[in-house]
Structure formats: structure tokens, C-alpha cells
Amino acid sequence: MKIKGIDVSEWQEGIHWKNAKKDGVQFGMLRAGYGSAILYPEQYDKTFEQNYKWAKEAGVNVGAYWYSYASTAEQAKTEAESFIKALKGKQFEYPVAMDVEETCITTEAVKAFCSELEGHGYYVMIYANLDYLNNRLDMSQLTQYDVWCADWSDSCGYSRAGIWQYTADGSVNGIKGRVDMNYSFLDYASVIKDAGLNGYKATSDDTVPCVEAKKILEKLAHAKQDIADIEAMVK
């Protein structure tokens, strides 16, 4: 399964989401802001509300992400509170992600950020490139969270990736200039809605709980990688 998507911020202002959908875009990861925006409101992304509204109207599934600068658990919690404020009252079919790019970010900060979001009923994901995932973060402490891997190559080099950002130089109808392109390997929309996360209500009383849903998705991710490895061997 490969579901085509994009991730956007105020750098791609004025997106025509209906045209993007016609061009095959099925989901969009929207930047909500960065840093401690609850203390510094100018750090909220000025296009987040507009992108959310227009993507929804176009029938494009949405997730969200927050660009982090947190080096401590305390800073991470403040950032998470800022993110939650932006997410409140909305529904997201795709995960909400911590964007880990700055060298100051620690594993402890990532744990604190993700735990805060998860405690508020969100399906949480970690965005990072291969170097961070393999060398900078202790991913053994973060196995309960899905991974959105930035790896600008012909195939995703991280076996646990639920979403793969495969280029920052994409082109999509409805967007001026270049845009980050992604593939989702999992049907997040179904799992999130069924589990009653990200602003949705559970579809039934016996819905798979959040933690169990994540375990299922992790197994699917491993199965996806196993299939890819087998296909590579027979080519």
C-alpha cells in the first residue's frame, strides 16, 4: 500500500487543495507551528487554519506536525501544549507528529512531547531523517510511536516507517513551487477513526484501544518491509 501525500506550511501559501486532490494527493500533513507558540503566538503557522479548512472541503485527509526546538522535557511539554491548542476542535485522519530536526532535541524531550499528545487522545508520530533515527535518538525508548522518515532516495531506509518523505523537490497541481512528497504505507484514516483518536469518536464500544492499534500497525509495517526485502531479492 502506498498512499500519496504532501506536507506543507506557510511556505506553500495559497494551496488549491481540490487541484492537488485531482493530481493524486490523498493526505496532507499540515504544519501547525513551531517552538513555544503558546508563549509566542507569532510562532503559530499562519496558513494552518486555512489549509485545514480547504483540505477538508476538498476531501483530502489531514494530519498535523509541530517543528520542535525542545532540548528538555519541560520545554517539550510547553511545545506540546502549544500544539494541542492549535489542534483543539479539529479532526485529523492522519497522525499528529513531532518534527525532529534540530540538534538540540533529546530523546527525553521527544518522549515528553509525544506522551503529552497521546494523553490527550492523539495518535502520535515522530518525524526525523535517517541520521536522527539511527544515530541521534534512542529509538528503543520510542517504539510505541510510529515513524515518519525523511529519506530522499529510491526506497525508504527505515523499516518501521509508517510514512516516508521521499523528496523535498516535488511538484503538485495547485501548489506554486516545490513541495515535500510522501507515501503512507498504512491506512491511518481507518485506524484513527475506528479507535476514536484525533478528535473522532470510536465507531463501536469494542474498538481496538490506542495501544493495541499501534501494535497492529507496527506489525503491518514490519510485514511491509519483509515483502519489500523479498521483492528486492527476486529482482
Task: Tell me the role of every PLM-derived stretch.
Residues 204-235:
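Short, low-complexity, charged amphipathic interaction modules
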Residues 92-162:
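Catalytic domains of cell-wall/extracellular-matrix polysaccharide-remodeling enzymes
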Residues 1-12, 18-19, 140-211:
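Functionally critical loop-and-helix segments that line ligand-binding/catalytic clefts
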Residues 86, 194, 233:
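Residues that form generic nucleotide/phosphate-binding pockets
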Residues 36-37, 71, 133, 156, ...:
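Flexible, glycine-rich phosphate/dinucleotide-binding loops
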Residues 1-114, 118-123:
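Substrate-binding cleft of extracellular glycoside hydrolase catalytic domains
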